[in-house]
């Protein structure tokens, strides 16, 4: 197996160049998928036979919850790569993704509360799924706070990596909480291995929204990583040339 691509990821210059090609595709994909998914889900999907139109918040809640968990797994992977292979771009990715993951967790909690009020009769209950998602938000806050509180970049990277790796144990708890404990939450809306329980008119726009959220995540994280690479490599000749070219292009 050719691992050249993996070793190239250790080069900030190579990453900056290749990410510039990926970024527009992620942005375009996010715009198209989210637009189509939102219009289809809110305007054309039929109402649920039990929940009526209140179920439509699923088109925001489920993608945000999926992305919140996936993002934290990414943080843990970046932590392992940073600790084992000493790849500085892993810390760049970790720091760039953490705030996005925190926002997605917050959105999932807020939309869940809005959905829960007409469904359960309460904005919040100490349900296993809700509690573990709240813990996930605090884990994100911890990673962000550690990254900003420790002035030494290497020490901050190690501390954030360790917290991300330790905290990833919360992800299977979130996923399987509805099976391990008696919770108010329903099982997964759809999975890769099973046919969705809802009709295609409902789950297709949901799938589009999930894919759109992931494209949005990719675009935002790449933008944040590119800015951080420029900041950290500010003294490098290639960065000065890049900034000079951008200034000349803008003027």
Segments (PLM) and residue ranges:
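Polytopic transmembrane helical bundles with strong interfacial aromatic enrichment
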Residues: 1-251
């Amino acid at each position: 197996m050719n691992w050249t691509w993996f070793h190239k990821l250790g080069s900030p210059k190579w990453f900056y160049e290749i990410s510039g090609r990926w970024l527009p595709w992620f942005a375009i994909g996010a715009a198209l998928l989210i637009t189509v998914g939102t219009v289809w889900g809110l305007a054309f999907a039929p109402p649920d036979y039990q929940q009526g139109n209140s179920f439509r918040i699923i088109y925001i809640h489920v993608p945000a919850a999926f992305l919140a968990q996936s993002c934290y797994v990414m943080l843990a992977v970046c932590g392992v790569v940073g600790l084992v292979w000493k790849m500085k771009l892993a810390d760049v990715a970790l720091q760039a993704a953490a705030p996005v993951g925190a926002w997605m967790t917050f959105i999932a909690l807020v939309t869940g509360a809005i959905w829960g009020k007409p469904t359960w009769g309460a904005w919040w209950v100490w349900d296993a799924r809700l509690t573990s998602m709240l813990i996930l938000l605090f884990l994100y806050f911890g990673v962000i706070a550690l990254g900003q509180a420790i002035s030494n970049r290497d020490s901050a990277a190690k501390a954030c990596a360790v917290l991300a790796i330790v905290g990833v144990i919360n992800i299977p708890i979130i996923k399987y909480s509805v099976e391990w404990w008696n919770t108010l939450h329903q099982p997964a809306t759809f999975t890769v291995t099973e046919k969705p329980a809802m009709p295609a008119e409902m789950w297709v726009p949901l799938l589009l929204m999930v894919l759109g959220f992931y494209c949005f995540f990719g675009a935002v994280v790449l933008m944040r990583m590119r800015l951080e690479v420029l900041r950290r490599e500010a003294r490098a000749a290639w960065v000065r040339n890049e900034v000079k070219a951008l200034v000349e292009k803008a003027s």
